[in-house]
């Protein structure tokens, strides 16, 4: 079929936009034709828009990697600037942190934080917990049956049955614990499992499906699955359960900044930083009724690194849960962050794309760790926490010194 006919039929809605890759067996050609269909469609006809004449690029991209994995109805790709902060010394290693952002001053500020941290010997960071969660809703005919199911899940015998079914779903998924809450005759079951180097949402969802089938075969035939996700997980929304129980990687990172580095690099004082952190990040956040937001701007750094490394940017909602603490220790500044729900992976999702894969490689965490599955994803979580630590340190310093507006005018406003 001639391209002109494909475009005409697509414009009239007789060929679905989503079917072009399958029909043409050529992802790049499908993108090219879809751009023309969108340009000629009545939805864009009255706004003088053409994708061919637009600044949105489409050539020179690996759409085969995108197909069936990352995006649908593709008309191009969105270039976002990528900068590097650092290198920063973390657990004895020097690493650059890639950050993809359009916010001027963010990379420069984080880089300044890295410099100050290195002056004190670097960051020490630990993974305190590692478990992705999924929480389906199941429904029973009566409250009594829901209660019996909750009790069974909490028993050794019940857990072993569920564990066997769950673990059989994957080489890497390993069930850690189950927490069930009954609301009337509905049961919300929060499964927690390790998922290797994958972020793990798809993996754990598959395991949960098999676990629920096992439940139905072991005395709970009347159980109906209302939804595989019941928001007790909780994914992509603020939730106390993630702050308290953790989700993904639970990480803490700490550094000591010598007084001279605080004064010379950060242009402030230890006393001013400690006071500002209490007033802003602790008291101010409490006044605001913050949930997991006891920090200055953790989400800025988390999202920038996520975009650069192929993570799910929407998961910055829970991944940015951060408690920032600053103390005066013998005249120097001790700063730490506690992040209970960093959700990252080094395989799957956007990590299959070439540019994102390259940034993971630069950080030394690309792909699956063949010797210790999960180690690369844990290392990435530590690097995210180190970046957040640097970002918190620099922004709070700018606020305490009164230089925030000046720095943004310098880095975020084009002259002339």
Curated annotation (Swiss-Prot):
PROSITE patterns found in the cross-reference section: HMG_COA_REDUCTASE_1, HMG_COA_REDUCTASE_2, HMG_COA_REDUCTASE_3, HMG_COA_REDUCTASE_4
Enzyme class: oxidoreductase
Chain segments annotated as transmembrane: 380-400
CC annotations in GO: endoplasmic reticulum membrane; peroxisomal membrane
Pathway assigned to this chain's UniProt record: Metabolic intermediate biosynthesis; (R)-mevalonate biosynthesis; (R)-mevalonate from acetyl-CoA: step 3/3
Stored Gene3D superfamilies: 3-hydroxy-3-methylglutaryl-coenzyme A Reductase, Chain A, domain 2 (3.90.770.10), HMGR, N-terminal domain (1.10.3270.10), Hydroxymethylglutaryl-CoA reductase, class I/II, NAD/NADP-binding domain (3.30.70.420)
One example of a Gene Ontology biological process annotation: secondary metabolic process
EC identifiers of the protein: 1.1.1.34
Record-linked InterPro entries: HMG_CoA_Rdtase, HMG_CoA_Rdtase_cat_sf, HMG_CoA_Rdtase_CS, HMG_CoA_Rdtase_eu_arc, HMG_CoA_Rdtase_N, HMG_CoA_Rdtase_NAD(P)-bd_sf, HMG_CoA_Rdtase_sub-bd_dom_sf
Membrane topology value: Single-pass membrane protein
Keywords noted in UniProt: Glycoprotein, Lipid biosynthesis, Lipid metabolism, Membrane, NADP, Oxidoreductase, Steroid biosynthesis, Steroid metabolism, Sterol biosynthesis, Sterol metabolism, Transmembrane, Transmembrane helix
Upregulation: Expression is positively regulated by the cluster-specific transcription factor pbcR.
Reaction(s) this enzyme catalyzes, per UniProt: (R)-mevalonate + 2 NADP(+) + CoA = (3S)-3-hydroxy-3-methylglutaryl-CoA + 2 NADPH + 2 H(+)
Active site: 103 (charge relay system), 236 (charge relay system), 312 (charge relay system), 408 (proton donor)
Top-level lineage group: Eukaryota
Glycosylation sites noted in the Swiss-Prot or TrEMBL record: 167, 277
GO MF, one example: hydroxymethylglutaryl-CoA reductase (NADPH) activity
Presence of the UniProt keyword Translocase in the record: no
Compartment(s): Membrane
Role according to the record: 3-hydroxy-3-methylglutaryl coenzyme A reductase; part of the gene cluster that mediates the biosynthesis of the diterpene ent-pimara-8(14),15-diene (PD). Within the cluster, the HMG-CoA reductase AN1593 functions in the mevalonate pathway, which produces isoprenoid precursors. The geranylgeranyl pyrophosphate (GGPP) synthase AN1592 is needed in the formation of GGPP, the precursor for diterpenes. Lastly, the pimaradiene synthase pbcA performs the 2 cyclization steps that convert GGPP to ent-pimara-8(14),15-diene.
Family, per entry: Belongs to the HMG-CoA reductase family.
Protein name per UniProt: 3-hydroxy-3-methylglutaryl coenzyme A reductase AN1593
Phylogenetic placement of the source organism: Eukaryota, Fungi, Dikarya, Ascomycota, Pezizomycotina
